[in-house]
Amino acid sequence: MKRLEGKVAIVTSSTRGIGRASAEALAKEGALVYLAARSEELANEVIADIKKQGGVAKFVYFNAREEETYTSMVEKVAEAEGRIDILVNNYGGTNVNLDKNLTAGDTDEFFRILKDNVQSVYLPAKAAIPHMEKVGGGSIVNISTIGSVVPDISRIAYCVSKSAINSLTQNIALQYARKNIRCNAVLPGLIGTRAALENMTDEFRDSFLGHVPLNRVGRPEDIANAVLYYASDDSGYVTGMIHEVAGGFALGTPQYSEYCPR
């Protein structure tokens, strides 16, 4: 029997990158996966690929710019399937043109990004937990970032918002542990998604990798493997974890890249 047989999962922003890889991993293990996304056309392409791999997936409309859809997507899935077992909060964003350091960054944009990213966990979790309680438990997996625990020279809004998600993760974990609802966060490092690669120079990438002991850019599947672990009963005695999946980034001293060159 597959690890997630009979389970119903929701994955936000799941038509590409980490979200898509996570949806595919959950479906491969038997979950019925709802792709929460803006574009039904893009979602259907992923659904077709999942079907080819022997899995089952469906589309539910979600748009981070339409706050009410955080709740409506959950309610639509619960109404259609009668249960929700797994929630993967993958959505997160910034504005590379305005999210800079404290004095150079745009103040209004700082608070917009903070609100956007925190509510991307708060609202769907709040909506899903009552449905998880009805079926005796569930698992919430929040996608954060290594930048939430290692300060950055830029992207202050993104990093602070993801730090808040780490705290929210642990608060949810504690508050609902007695209901058998687990909540964990996965913190990606440098992952080779299109969005990430389009926003970095080769020079930046090489400099960053100098501080990654495993000496490679991560793959979306690396994150999906962690998501699958927390979604399944393999982690049935684990909650409140802030799990870095970053190739060992920041393990070394500041001189690491000098004394252990690539």
UniProtKB/Swiss-Prot annotation:
The keyword Electron transport does not apply. InterPro entries: NAD(P)-bd_dom_sf (IPR036291), SDR (IPR050259), SDR_fam (IPR002347). It is an enzyme of class 1 (oxidoreductase). Shows a maximum of activity between pH 7.5 and 8.0 both in the oxidation reaction of cholate and in the reduction reaction of 3alpha,12alpha-dihydroxy-7-oxo-5beta-cholanate. The keyword Lipid metabolism applies. The record marks K162 as: Lowers pKa of active site Tyr. CDD domains: SDR_c. The active site is at Y158. Optimum temperature is 40 degrees Celsius. No activity is detected above 60 degrees Celsius. Activated by metal ions such as Mg(2+), Na(+) and K(+). It comes from the Bacteria. Taurochenodeoxycholate binds at T145, Y158. Its EC number is 1.1.1.-. SUPFAM superfamilies: NAD(P)-binding Rossmann-fold domains. Belongs to the short-chain dehydrogenases/reductases (SDR) family. 7alpha-hydroxysteroid dehydrogenase that catalyzes the NADP(+)-dependent oxidation of the 7alpha-hydroxy group of 7alpha-hydroxysteroids, such as cholate, chenodeoxycholate, glycochenodeoxycholate and taurochenodeoxycholate, to the corresponding 7-oxosteroids. Is also able to catalyze the reverse reduction reactions. Homotetramer. A dynamic equilibrium between dimers and tetramers seems to exist. This is 7alpha-hydroxysteroid dehydrogenase.
